């Protein structure tokens, strides 16, 4: 149980110690006796010796801080005071640790030396994906120069504009190139329709030069089975024309007009046969190319179908675990 107030240690020990003791020694001794209760306070002489040993280890001229009492001269005795009265009202040496550095609130933070770094440039330097482009595929407008807000602390007197280091210029140029690359990726999200006539299959097809010569018109460009396209009329099957019945002409009627007409008919028949053979040769060479191309395309279709079935299986497993997309 706590003792009554009359039995406790008298109050003078809290305010001041015995004569010759340091001003703070009595207060510490009274506080300790108040906390210990019935225990007997220690002798002032031992406290005085410990106080002298502690002061001997400390430097002779501590740096005072704001709001603290200024210590007296170094050669003054520890028990000397400058005036009478209670220890709270007079100035003297302060018992307790002294500050050897300026206080935190007295430091002036270098707000003017802060450099602002672009977020996208920082992400690109560290190998991280940049921020997504704004909607519409438009490049973001350059942000105006930002001025740092001054701190409300007492040490901040003025703030200067942020300085841009020369290393930021290539980073911004890289950022612009990356922005254009992202815009290109956005435009390729919905691919434009591809003309089938412009698609070329990677294959090796070397036709016989004699076949190409028979398939080409003399004096014109060499027939190319890869690029040549036949019209619908040319691909239609030609009807078989019945040969006309041969008419026997007597020898006395074979005049010059007859031979002229006969010569013209023979020339027309020869031209028709040559054109028909040329067309047949072109179709045969073109068909050989298309057969080989068709075989390669069938192999590609089989590979694409296998890949599609694999990705469908992966998608079905993902949807079974995480739900539909």
Swiss-Prot record:
Residues 283-297 are annotated as: Leucine-zipper. It comes from Mus musculus. The gene is Dbp. GO terms for molecular function: DNA-binding transcription activator activity, RNA polymerase II-specific; RNA polymerase II transcription regulatory region sequence-specific DNA binding. Transmembrane segments: none annotated. Expressed in the suprachiasmatic nuclei (SCN) and in most peripheral tissues, with a strong circadian rhythmicity. Induction: Accumulates according to a robust circadian rhythm in liver and kidney. In liver nuclei, the amplitude of daily oscillation has been estimated to be >50-fold, and 2-fold in the brain. SUPFAM superfamilies: Leucine zipper domain. This is D site-binding protein. The keyword Repeat does not apply. PANTHER family: D SITE-BINDING PROTEIN, THYROTROPH EMBRYONIC FACTOR RELATED. Residues 71-80, 88-98, 154-171 have a biased composition (Low complexity). This transcriptional activator recognizes and binds to the sequence 5'-RTTAYGTAAY-3' found in the promoter of genes such as albumin, CYP2A4 and CYP2A5. It is not essential for circadian rhythm generation, but modulates important clock output genes. May be a direct target for regulation by the circadian pacemaker component clock. May affect circadian period and sleep regulation. Binds DNA as a homodimer or a heterodimer. Can form a heterodimer with TEF. Residues 255-318 form the bZIP domain. Residues 257-279 are annotated as: Basic motif. Keywords: Activator, Biological rhythms, DNA-binding, Nucleus, Phosphoprotein, Transcription, Transcription regulation. One of its GO terms (biological process) is circadian rhythm. InterPro entries: bZIP, bZIP_sf, PAR_bZIP. The keyword Membrane does not apply. Belongs to the bZIP family. PAR subfamily. Its main location: nucleus. Residues 17-28 have a biased composition (Gly residues). The modification Phosphoserine is found at residue 86. It is found in: Nucleus.
